[in-house]
Amino acid sequence: MVYTMCKKKQRKNRKCGQAEYMKYEHITEGRFIERPNRFIAHVEINGQVETVHVKNTGRCRELLIPGTQVFLEKSSNPARKTAYDLICVNKKGRGLINMDSQIPNKAALEWVKAGHLFPEKVQVTPEKTYGNSRFDLYVCSEKRKAFIEVKGVTLESDNIARFPDAPTERGVKHLKELIHCMQEGYEAYLLLVIQMKGVDRFEPNWETHREFGETLQEAERAGVHILAYDCLVEPDRMEIQDPVPVCLASDWK
């Protein structure tokens, strides 16, 4: 089954005139077979086994299970070694989960531009450098100057979304940089984009990387805004939707 969509045709926010969600084009259904390494997977598409690019270098072990229904975007570049990108998984008992690690930043950019985070009109700059740091988004207006770091969340168990799915020293570094921004007089936000619907809350993945959870607690105490939002996920699109409770208490020993 093939879905043909156009990236340019995005729904507009009536108030702000900005795109509210990210769309893919030329979506194809397949069945996951195996993942030889972090970058590629073997997927059965229309009866043929294809080597496809995995748009997420995380472990994703709970998602990429043999026989699982997946959705892929066909590349428009004929020179590529792989013709498809694996972007979405239909997890048993959960439904569709977008696993594209690039889309949270893009979706967050459009979502903030559309006026969903701040009440006033803001100017949003992606990939903004400040000192020795580079943040996903920089927001400025007459009322505020803020840095936003975006993290995509694909790990879920028992209706709880968790991050990270593997130890992330880079993630710890980003949190410490947000704390530094607060100390310099800026607003600072960690925006957790949960790439699925229906979770009850977000928690740090204490068992996988305790230091990240502890640094997240430190960031909250320093005044960093920790926000989590779920997403409506369809084979051809992902839309940031509703706030999700954030629980930073540690019950893991």
Task: Tell me what each language-model feature is.
Residues 49-62:
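Beta-strand/loop nucleic-acid-binding surfaces
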Residues 116-130:
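A short acidic/basic microdomain associated with nuclease active sites
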Residues 3-6, 11-12, 196-253:
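Domain-level recognition of nuclease-like catalytic cores that cleave nucleotide substrates
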Residues 80-93:
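OB-fold/S1-family single-stranded nucleic acid-binding modules
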Residues 68-77, 230:
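Flexible glycine-rich surface loops and low-complexity tracts that mediate binding to linear polymers
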Residues 159-169, 179-208, 230:
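Nucleic-acid nuclease catalytic cores
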Residues 30, 135-165, 178:
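Conserved catalytic cores of phosphodiester-cleaving nucleases, focusing on short active-site segments
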Residues 37-42:
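Short aromatic-glycine-enriched beta-strand elements
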